[in-house]
């Protein structure tokens, strides 16, 4: 890894029906900021506004998103529309955009394309125990919705995936 890659700052955003999760990674693997933002009304416009504020505040070199158009990825039309608007916003701000498929993410974190989100979250909680261990949701029951905190782990995974490729 070259010196400039070690010093760069990444903003990774994981979109969901709840809102979005985010992670800011600096240097090799320093988790500077992370969290999730729940958006209840006017989801796309409000999500876009929050993400723009994060770009202005964090001044990342790269924006990392999940590739919503990758083979095998099923995302709601609203999420795909928001994704396009975020890419346009980033390009308008001359920000490099990297898109990573869910398959690539699982391959890097689990060495297995068929792994599940809970397994990825557990790996990330071990990698960043001080930051993420207390936010690790319990294993989801089949009849329950995914915990909104999973968006944080998705975002951290996206950032690490880009950093380590």
Residue ranges and their predicted role:
Residues 1-165:
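Phosphate- and other anionic-substrate recognition elements at nucleic-acid/protein interfaces
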């Amino acid at each position: 890894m070259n010196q400039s890659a070690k010093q760069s700052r990444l903003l990774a955003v994981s979109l969901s029906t709840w809102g979005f999760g985010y992670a800011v990674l600096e240097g090799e693997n320093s988790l500077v900021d992370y969290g999730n933002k729940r958006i209840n009304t006017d989801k796309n416009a409000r999500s876009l506004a929050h993400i723009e504020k994060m770009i202005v505040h964090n001044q990342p070199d790269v924006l990392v998103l999940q590739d919503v158009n990758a083979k095998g990825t099923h995302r709601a039309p609203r999420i795909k529309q928001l994704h396009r608007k975020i890419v346009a916003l980033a390009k308008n701000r001359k920000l490099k955009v990297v898109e990573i498929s869910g398959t690539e993410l699982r391959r890097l974190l689990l060495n297995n394309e068929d792994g599940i989100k809970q397994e990825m979250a557990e790996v990330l909680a071990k990698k960043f125990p001080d930051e993420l261990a207390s936010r690790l949701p319990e294993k989801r029951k089949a009849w329950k919705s995914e915990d909104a905190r999973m968006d944080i782990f998705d975002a951290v995974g996206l950032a690490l995936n880009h950093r380590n490729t």
